[in-house]
């Protein structure tokens, strides 16, 4: 399981500016696998404690959503030994090559960039505005697994619970539950 979180701290809030200045004085080198910083470790421990489930947990803090997505896919592929990924129409997953491949929209993200990474499959996102019901979206996945994609090759399904780029579409809870099953 992987989560990609963003926090809006506002524009130039004095407390945020002070915290950034303080940390800039403390850093010697920053990257996720060299983290000798008390604040990083404390936050990671708090996130691990807040994550439900009785299993070992690890937290990695990264700079961008695209970086989080890339790492989530790498982790899923390494853990499962599979390489396929299902994404959804209207999705936005970043401007890196893998992020663009996962994004469910050609223009302006993929147009003119040539071949995308293989084994990325797009399925319809349930969206009444686009005439796609939950049942139709699930039916498409079933047909996909029966005719085009071996489900045993799928490492991950990546979905935004709320699509921003796709038009602020909320994934129906029952659809998310059905995907999990």
Describe every region a protein language model picked out.
Residues 3-83:
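Glycine-rich loop-to-alpha-helix module at the N-terminal edge of alpha/beta enzyme cores
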Residues 6-8, 36, 129-131, 164-166:
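Short, small-residue-enriched loops and turns at beta-alpha junctions
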Residues 64, 88-90, 125:
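Cofactor-binding loop segments of dinucleotide-utilizing enzymes, especially the Rossmann-like FAD-
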Residues 77-81, 101-110, 174-178:
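A glycine- and small-aliphatic-rich helix-loop capping segment at beta-alpha/alpha-beta transitions
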Residues 78-94:
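Conserved PLP-anchoring active-site segment centered on the Schiff-base-forming lysine
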Residues 92-162, 170:
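PLP-dependent aminotransferase-class I/II
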Residues 151, 169-181:
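Catalytic PLP-binding core of fold-type I/II PLP enzymes
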């Amino acid at each position: 399981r992987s989560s990609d979180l963003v926090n809006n701290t506002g524009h130039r809030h004095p407390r945020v500016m002070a915290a950034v200045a303080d940390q800039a004085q403390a850093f010697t080198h920053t990257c996720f696998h060299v983290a000798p910083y008390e604040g990083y470790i404390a936050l990671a421990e708090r996130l691990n404690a807040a994550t439900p489930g009785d299993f070992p947990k690890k937290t990695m803090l990264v700079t961008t959503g695209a970086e989080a997505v890339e790492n989530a896919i790498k982790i899923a592929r390494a853990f499962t030994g599979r390489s396929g990924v299902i994404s959804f129409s209207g999705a936005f997953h970043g401007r890196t090559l893998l992020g663009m491949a996962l994004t469910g929209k050609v223009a302006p993200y993929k147009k003119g960039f040539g071949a995308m990474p293989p084994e990325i499959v797009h399925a319809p996102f349930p969206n009444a505005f686009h005439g796609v019901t939950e049942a139709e979206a699930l039916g498409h996945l079933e047909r996909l697994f029966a005719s085009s994609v071996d489900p045993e090759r799928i490492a991950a399904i990546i979905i935004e619970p709320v699509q921003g780029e796709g038009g602020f579409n909320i994934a129906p809870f029952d659809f998310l539950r059905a995907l999990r099953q």
